[in-house]
Amino acid sequence: MSILDEFKSFIAKGNVMDMAVGIIIGAAFTGIVSSLVADLINPIIGLITGGIDFSNLFVNLGDGDYASLAAARDAGAPVFAYGSFITAVINFLIIAWVVFLLVKIVNRVKDAAIHKSAKEAEAQPAGPTQEQLLAEIRDLLKRSPA
């Protein structure tokens, strides 16, 4: 088997296709979560904490005084932008929580399907064994005129 054939076989597997779909959906989901955090959660946290905007929290490591992180970055000042890190952590926690819930739901659905198929398998009467079928064939052959 050539390397190209092996690659085609690898790509055609269901897990690779599922992973590709997951990555595409995950990339789209990241934008949604970023907007959720920046536009909805951070303002609520800011309201609770007295108007703190996490995305604008920074420590200036150089000379000068800057009113905002954007102004410090525009001036080329070295900054320790810990507010951006806090926002990234909040994004991560939300994404991790949603993925956890999705995996939990998928596992419940799988378990329910497995449980249902196991019940159906128990409910079906067992068919004749191979020996019983062979014995029936033998008996039929004995009875039939040659």
Curated annotation (Swiss-Prot):
Annotated GO MF terms: mechanosensitive monoatomic ion channel activity
Pfam family, one: MscL
Protein localization: Cell inner membrane
Transmembrane region(s): 21-41, 44-64, 83-103
Cellular component, GO annotation: plasma membrane
Membrane topology field: Multi-pass membrane protein
Keyword field: Cell inner membrane, Cell membrane, Ion channel, Ion transport, Membrane, Transmembrane, Transmembrane helix, Transport
Similarity annotation: Belongs to the MscL family.
Assembly mode: Homopentamer.
NCBIfam families: mscL, PRK00567.1-4, PRK13952.1
Known role: Channel that opens in response to stretch forces in the membrane lipid bilayer. May participate in the regulation of osmotic pressure changes within the cell.
Name under which the protein is recorded: Large-conductance mechanosensitive channel
Source organism of this protein record: Cereibacter sphaeroides (strain ATCC 17029 / ATH 2.4.9) (Rhodobacter sphaeroides)
